[in-house]
Amino acid sequence: MENSSALLITYPDYPVNTDTFYGYTTLVGHAGVLLIKSNGLTKYYEFGRYDPAKNGLVKNRRIPNAQITSDGKPTTSSLKNILSILSTESGKGGRIIAAYFINVDFDKMLAQATKAQPKYDIKSFNCGQYAESVILQGNPRIDRPLIINPTPNNIVDEYIEEGNAEVLFSPTTGEISIGEGDESDAKN
């Protein structure tokens, strides 16, 4: 298994149009997926109702590559820089909460991220479920939580509860924290 990594990202304060009488809400968040190849090559994708018909469209953002440490992980400073850019360009300047996945196959995730996707559906295929599908393609042995509430915020929370490291980024302070995580049983 390739020693690449990925972040299942949520922007928890992102204002989402529910297309109902409720209007906009910040209770569900918006999600994307950050792919980091073992050599530092970095790609970011998100899925949403960006097209006029609101059927769903994959967007990618140009971001800098990560600097990689001797143990194969992105440096904290390069990850902080990437998350700062994503907060501004994809998260409307809001906070980021992410589940960190290790030992995933970059090329398989990239293929999943860029292929034709099902039609957007708030319950059965939203931005969070898209990002999750990309990561699961990178390692089918990842422990999958039972997700009853498929909002982007909840999907990320469930994967953190499964033992993936929690990554927090505050655009206000510029601070990043990366938890330990214990997902080794599913990463071999």
Language model features with spans:
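Short linear sequence elements within intrinsically disordered, low-complexity coil regions
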Residues: V16, Y50, N55, D105-F106, ...
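Solvent-exposed, acidic/flexible segments
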Residues: Y24-V28, G72-T75, A99-F106, Y120-G128
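A general marker of short, structured functional hotspots
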Residues: L7-T10, G40-L41, E46, I96-I97, ...
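Compositionally biased, intrinsically disordered low-complexity regions enriched in proline and serine
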Residues: P12, Y45-E46, D51, F101-I102, ...
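Second-shell loop/turn segments in exported
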Residues: D19-Y22, K92-A98, A113-I122
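Glycine-rich catalytic cores of cysteine/serine-nucleophile enzymes that process amide/ester linkages
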Residues: M1-K92
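Activation targets extended, charge/polar-rich intrinsically disordered C-terminal tails
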Residues: F106-N188
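A structural motif
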Residues: L83-A111
